[in-house]
A protein has these predicted regions:
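N-terminal glycine-rich phosphate/adenylate-binding segment common to multiple enzyme folds
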Residues: 1-40, 45-48, 136
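Short acidic loop-to-helix transition motifs that present clustered carboxylates
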Residues: 5, 112-119
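Solvent-exposed alpha-helices and their adjacent loops that cap or buttress functional pockets
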Residues: 11-16, 71, 101-103, 122-125, ...
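Glycine-rich phosphate/diphosphate-binding loop of Rossmann-like nucleotide-binding domains
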Residues: 42-115, 127
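Flexible, glycine/charged-enriched surface loops at secondary-structure junctions
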Residues: 72-81, 104-112, 204-212, 221-232
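Glycine-rich phosphate/nucleotide-binding loop
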Residues: 121-223
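Short, amphipathic C-terminal "tail helix"
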Residues: 225-247
Length: 247
């Protein structure tokens, strides 16, 4: 989401133009550990890694994307694919998507291959509402999307158990950033916004809304922003500004 006052690296984009959700499958797909290496240390060495897509896993994430669209009042779900090149798993992914979307006739859908989809993220980010993607594609898009708003430092994420049978986990898209630990330059917004996502997931809608509103107020003033957003605040100062705006 592009906030008011935050410098956008994309030309002629303003707050309201970029506000998308990336729904990523996070238990199987391209990041399975099925495979191995053969003929090591020879000139015929081979490395193989399999993509695993199950109807259970694919249906779960795609259904969640549509249910999220209903819950959040979003109007469109975009399918990220590459079935013109990945000839087995991606056609399967598309088949499941085309089946599931029929259960949600009130929600618009479209589909793009991942290469042109990334180009469209940069050229026309306002086109997108909710994008559902495999593990690898979702990993890429969930970094590219925030970068289009100026920094990945503000982007939140959640590893969701849709059935609420088990705990869900919330963290910034950028992870723990150990390379800058203790330097006071990390943007705390991603962590704070992840907390708001958690509250929203737990049903604390007003508390979540209060935090997001405070984030918007904080980022609208340049001095409150960290260096990645051309501001002058350190981590603690930026976090304190968010807290002060809540109070």
């Amino acid at each position: 989401k592009l906030f008011d006052g935050v410098p956008c690296p994309l030309a002629n984009k303003k707050p309201g133009d970029i506000d998308m959700l990336i729904v990523r499958e996070n238990t199987e797909g391209e990041y399975s550990s099925v495979g191995g290496r053969m003929y090591k240390n020879t000139d015929r060495e081979i490395a193989i890694q399999e993509t695993i897509m199950s109807s259970h896993g694919v249906d779960r994430v795609q259904k969640y994307a549509f249910e999220l669209a209903k819950l959040k009042g979003r109007k469109k779900v975009t399918n990220a694919t590459k079935s013109n090149g990945i000839s087995i798993t991606m056609p399967f992914w598309d088949e499941r998507f085309n089946k599931i979307k029929k259960k949600y006739p009130e929600i618009k859908t479209d589909q793009f291959h991942i290469d042109i989809l990334t180009a469209r993220f940069v050229l026309t980010p306002e086109w997108f509402d909710i994008v559902v993607a495999s593990n690898l594609f979702g990993d890429i898009l969930s970094d590219l999307g925030p970068a289009c708003t100026g920094t990945i430092g503000i982007a939140p994420s959640g590893n969701i158990n849709p059935e609420n049978k088990y705990p869900s986990l919330f963290e910034p898209v950028h992870g723990s950033a150990p390379d800058i630990a203790g330097m006071g330059i990390a943007n705390p917004i991603g962590q704070i916004w992840s907390g708001a996502l958690m509250l929203d997931h737990l049903g604390e809608k007003e508390a979540a809304k209060t935090i997001v509103t405070s984030i918007e107020k904080t980022l609208s003033i340049k001095e409150n922003r960290t260096k990645d957003l051309q501001g002058s605040s350190n981590t603690s100062q930026c976090a304190k500004a968010v807290l002060d705006n809540i109070n």
